[in-house]
Design a protein with these regions (language model features):
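Non-catalytic interaction-recognition regions
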Residues: 2-94, 110-564
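Short, charged, solvent-exposed linker or helix-capping segments at domain edges/interfaces
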Residues: 95-101
Length: 564
């Protein structure tokens, strides 16, 4: 709709003899005065050496004399010192509502289809999943769904950390405890990793032995490979169970180990392009740029003992992905604290002509904190395992209301998912946020349960009315008009979320849509409406409202329960 308004204003302005290539239309921050605003008068007045007030009044006068004024506008006024205030017509609003009913995707930005590889999830094998893993999984899954919805092809890869020092530590523990391979289970892994990690922090000799085991594993030691495969199998089962609960899925379950097949080729490329330098026996790549405002150290590709590092495997993984998928973009949904690491990797990739840096995107996310502003802990003071967090959220939700105890497990799980996911995705991806389960599980306020409640409330009305609805050109009151205009903001929210890789635009939108829908519902008694045209119009608007709420929830990885 903004595009229509922009084109009309541009045509009128150009017909007056002024040259303006693009007219900027923005949503009004004073909806009591107007729907949209144009702030280009100052720029245009400066370019044409005109008084902005005189110019603005001239343009608005011409708009009001436009032959199709009533088709597009209800009211267009000039506000000093240089703003054009626009109220759009019922005809224009309803025209776009009909497009949404037919296919809401028609209002989205259209781009040539591209292929995106999305790297998210990425837990380290043999470690229990904790609250921090929830963020990468949920944010990554949502971004994947948004990109798919925009018409692009996505390839998702969990990229497990399955070949690092933690594996050497666990293998050391297995050998020390003289376990048979069949005795390695998730209970043992949950116990042995933190135990060995603590020992290695205190005992340098054991730490070096674990590093040696890791190196031999990477070099192909058969016994260590046998134990590693069992550890990987057990750990993946647990990871999949947690990700299944979150409705997070991957096309590929590759790991760091898969990149080892490409390390020699990657090293060869770096050497052929004279990019590697020796530094105390190690191989490094200088990635510093003259324009850098902070120190960017060299990428350490290979240690002096011949061992490879995360930077080596991440670079080799880019090579692997270019060969396997030939993607247009590779996206990495990882902790903000990894930014320097990926800057080094991306710059090396570009210098080596593996993949240009502009096609590699670092999508950092902030941490999940408790009310004290520190990383979130359980009531007992521990960093919560993801499974324990699910159970804690269930307990809190069920305790909120007596009827919640009688809900099916499937419905409870869907609501718990909405609590966790909406809490996460309604916050700006790059920011830390305070995780408050009591607040996030309320049915009021900016929460997942509030969105679900609104949908089910509307759905109850719609299910009682089996009608093939058509829309008249009437709009009956301000809550009605506000809801219709809110429906038309949908495409902006999706376009912004896609462009910025920021799901919170969708979370913000669907919350505001639900607020408008509830105000509309409170002010308009639909079921008691005797005027059939009016009643049908309102049912039509509510049908569109639920259509968009449902689609937003899908993009936010939230399923709808049968009852609340």
């Amino acid at each position: 709709m903004k595009k229509d308004i922009s084109e009309i204003l541009k045509k009128i302005i150009n017909n007056l003899g002024y040259n303006l290539e693009e007219v900027t239309i923005s949503k009004s921050n004073r909806p009591d005065l107007c729907d949209f605003q144009c702030n280009d008068i100052f720029k245009l007045a400066k370019e044409n050496h005109k008084n902005p007030i005189e110019l603005g009044e001239e343009i608005v006068g011409s708009v009001n004399n436009y032959e199709e004024f009533n088709t597009y506008f209800k009211e267009v006024t000039f506000a000093r010192p240089g703003f054009i205030n626009i109220k759009v017509s019922n005809d224009l609003i309803n025209k776009y509502l009909k497009i949404i009913k037919e296919d809401e995707k028609k209002l989205l930005n259209q781009e040539p289809k591209e292929t995106f590889v999305i790297d998210y999830g990425g837990p380290n094998v043999a470690k229990p999943l904790h609250v921090g893993h929830m963020r990468t999984a949920i944010v990554g899954e949502s971004i994947k769904r948004i990109i798919n919805y925009m018409g692009h092809n996505t390839i998702s890869d969990v990229h497990l950390g399955d070949f690092g020092l933690q594996i050497g530590e666990v293998i050391y523990g297995v050998l020390r405890d003289k376990l048979s391979i069949d005795e390695i289970d998730i209970k043992y892994l949950d116990k042995i990793y933190p135990e060995m990690n603590a020992i290695c922090k205190e005992n340098e000799e054991i730490k070096n032995e674990c590093a040696n085991i890791t190196k031999q594993l990477q070099d192909g030691n058969q016994e260590y490979r046998r134990l590693w495969k069992k550890i990987l199998e057990v750990s993946k089962q647990d990871i999949k169970k947690n990700y299944d609960f979150l409705d997070v899925s991957f096309d590929y379950w590759y790991g760091e180990s898969d990149a080892y097949d490409y390390l020699e080729e990657t090293e060869k490329i770096l050497k052929e392009k004279n990019l590697v330098e020796e530094s105390e026996g190690a191989l490094v790549v200088n990635v510093k740029k003259d324009s850098d405002t902070k120190e960017i150290p060299p990428l350490l590709f290979k240690k002096s003992n011949g061992a490879y590092l995360y930077a080596s495997t991440d670079l080799s993984t880019i090579l692997q992905r270019t060969k396997d998928f030939n993607p247009d973009h590779i996206l990495y949904v990882v902790d903000n604290r990894q930014e320097l690491h990926f800057t080094q990797v991306f710059r090396t990739s570009e210098k080596a002509d593996i993949m240009p840096q502009e096609k590699l995107e670092f999508l950092g996310y902030g941490t999940v904190n408790g009310e004290d502003g520190k990383p979130y802990k359980t009531r007992s003071g521990n960093t919560p395992k993801l499974e324990n967090l699910f159970n804690e959220a269930k307990e809190i939700f069920i305790s909120k209301k007596e009827d919640n105890k009688n809900m099916s497990e499937e419905d409870v799980n869907k609501i718990v998912n909405s609590i966790l996911k909406f809490a996460d995705l309604s916050n700006t991806r790059t920011k830390d946020y305070i995780f408050d389960l009591n607040k996030f599980s309320d049915v009021t306020g900016k929460t997942g349960p509030y969105i679900l409640y609104t949908y089910l409330r509307i759905n109850k009305i719609l299910k009682s009315q089996n009608k093939n609805l058509e829309l008249s050109n009437n709009i009956y009151n301000e809550p009605d008009r506000d809801l219709r205009l809110k429906l038309l903001e949908y495409s902006d929210a999706i376009n912004y979320a896609y462009k910025e890789r920021m799901p919170h635009y969708i979370a913000d939108y669907v919350y505001n849509l639900c607020v408008s829908a509830n105000i509309f519902y409170q002010n308009n008694h639909i079921m008691n409406m005797e005027d059939e045209i009016n009643k049908n119009d309102w049912l039509y608007v509510l049908t569109l409202t639920n259509k968009l709420i449902k689609q937003c929830l899908k993009l936010l990885v939230i399923d709808i329960p049968s009852i609340m």
